[in-house]
Amino acid sequence: MALVPMVIEQTNRGERAYDIYSRLLRDNIIFLGTPIDDQIANLVIAQLLFLSAEDPDKDIQLYINSPGGSITAGLAIYDTMQFIKNDVVTYCIGQAASMGAFLLMSGTAGKRFALPNSRILIHQPSMGGLSGQATDIDIHAREILRIREITNNLMSKHTGQSLERIERDVERDFIMNAPQAKEYGIIDEIIDRPRV
């Protein structure tokens, strides 16, 4: 079980304790600091929808330090980011790998950032551990190809890179530092101080 820090605030009624994630949420900040699975995706989606309902015109900040994870869970977060009216400002702190990098580049254009020592990794989708009958494996292989086409097209759209370059670069792990990610179009700026 992970340790979640508590924040104590003084109010005119006394003290109030929050877990750190709830306190960040009050400032329109969502922190994605784990592998992405269905449970984490549901939490991030719920936070995006909540913040959008609270104020559809206020930027939502999504801080990412994730090794990636489930394609379907990540695409659910992606679709929600595109669905809500708010601009979603993305930040890479540490690493944004695989689906983490996909979400980083999917932030609002002009509002995608990385800290100087960030590591960004893109690659093609995979669904490891396939076994079973040949027909089932064939079904899953076709699904992987379908999802690869979707994610490659979306990466091309968000980075400005040609589809051919994306297809070539994601064939194997493609690792970038922050300046390389900026040049590639995954982020817009490298920052070392909070934006005001």
Swiss-Prot record:
Task: Write down a Pfam family by its short name.
Answer: CLP_protease
Write out the GO cellular component annotations. Answer: cytoplasm; endopeptidase Clp complex
Provide the protein's localization: Cytoplasm
Give disulfide pairs as residue numbers: none
A GO BP term here is:
protein quality control for misfolded or incompletely synthesized proteins
Q: Which residues form the active site?
A: 98, 123
Q: Name one GO molecular function term.
A: ATPase binding
Please write the reaction equations for the catalytic activity of this protein.
Hydrolysis of proteins to small peptides in the presence of ATP and magnesium. alpha-casein is the usual test substrate. In the absence of ATP, only oligopeptides shorter than five residues are hydrolyzed (such as succinyl-Leu-Tyr-|-NHMec, and Leu-Tyr-Leu-|-Tyr-Trp, in which cleavage of the -Tyr-|-Leu- and -Tyr-|-Trp bonds also occurs)
Q: What is its EC number?
A: 3.4.21.92
User: What is the top-level taxon of the source organism?
Assistant: Bacteria
Against CDD domains, the record matches this protein to: S14_ClpP_2
Provide the alphabetized UniProt keywords. Answer: Cytoplasm, Hydrolase, Protease, Serine protease
- Similarity section: Belongs to the peptidase S14 family.
Q: What subunit structure does UniProt give?
A: Fourteen ClpP subunits assemble into 2 heptameric rings which stack back to back to give a disk-like structure with a central cavity, resembling the structure of eukaryotic proteasomes.
What does the function comment of this entry state?
Cleaves peptides in various proteins in a process that requires ATP hydrolysis. Has a chymotrypsin-like activity. Plays a major role in the degradation of misfolded proteins.
Q: What is this protein called?
A: ATP-dependent Clp protease proteolytic subunit
- Provide the gene name from the record: clpP
